[in-house]
Every structure is written in C-alpha cells, then in structure tokens.
Amino acid sequence: SGQTCSKCKKRNHAMCTSECFSGLKIHTIRANYPLWLKRITEVQQGKAVLSVRQWSGKPYRSPQIEITRLTVKHGVDIQKVVLYRTEWYDDDNKCHYCYDVTLDNDKGINIDDIARNDGLNPIDFIEWFDRDICKQKLDDDGRVHKELAIIHFTKFRY
C-alpha cells in the first residue's frame, strides 16, 4: 500500500499482481520506532504474530487484505534507521538535496539496497519518505532527518 508499481506506475497498486513490483519486499519501513519495537518484541516472545496486509483499494478508505502472518520462526525483527536529507543552494540558485540512510549504530546503508529490499525503486523510495522528512526542522549541519523502523520479514539484516 502506498508504493508505486514500477511496471504500471500506479500509486495505488492493490490491483497489481506481485510480479509488477520492482523487487522482492523483504521488509517494510514505518514511522514510530518505539511502537513497532514493542510490537515486534511481542512477536519475538511468541505472544503475537505479524499480520502483513495491503489495502484492497484506496488506502485508508478500503478494507485491508491479509497477505501473510509471520512469527519469530520467519526471522521477524526490527532495526532503527535514520533517513537524512542534506540541503544546499548551488550557483544556479536552486535548492539541491542529497539523501542518506544510517542504522542506529551509524553504519551507512546504500539507499538503492534499502529501497529495493522495501519493494521500491530508489526514486519512488525517496519520494515516499520525503513527504515526512521535509516536515522536520533543519539541524545545525543543514540536514533534516527522520527516525524509522525497518520491520524485517526474513532473517536478513543490514
């Protein structure tokens, strides 16, 4: 839900088949890390399952369809990441942006890899998350950032 299908270019892709996606989705990225940490901890303790869903039609205005249920046996886990956007003005008098992603331990992640593993191409990934990051205030380094949760569906980790 909310992703752009790389083949048909529809933002609301609930009608798209899985082969339309730009890649295999092995995780999802969500805001509110503390909430997701609590939920994923319950899954890891065997007290809950992770229900992976998508909208059947228009997001937030249609029923959700459950795709699968995941447990600790599937490798469900969480990692905190920070998406940064650096802004500057060049000689052309236009604002330019550079994006980077780091884990909470400051290990950098290739933005192409994280986008692909989230089922998106890099441009769609940046466009999707830029809507939230642009609402943040500039820090002293001229960057804006947003803390996010990567919810892993498999044993893969960055």
Where do the PLM segments sit?
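Catalytic phosphate/metal-binding cores of nucleic-acid and nucleotide-processing enzymes, i.e., regions
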Residues: 1-158
